[in-house]
């Protein structure tokens, strides 16, 4: 859950 990612 980070900006531009699915983590």
From Swiss-Prot:
Subcellular location: Secreted, Cell wall
Secreted is among the record's keywords: yes
GO cellular component: extracellular region
Major localisation: secreted
Record's keyword terms, sorted: Cell wall, Secreted
Domain of life of the source: Eukaryota
Annotated protein name in UniProt: 10 kDa cell wall protein
Naturally occurring in which organism (per UniProt): Nicotiana tabacum
């Amino acid at each position: 859950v980070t900006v531009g990612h699915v983590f």
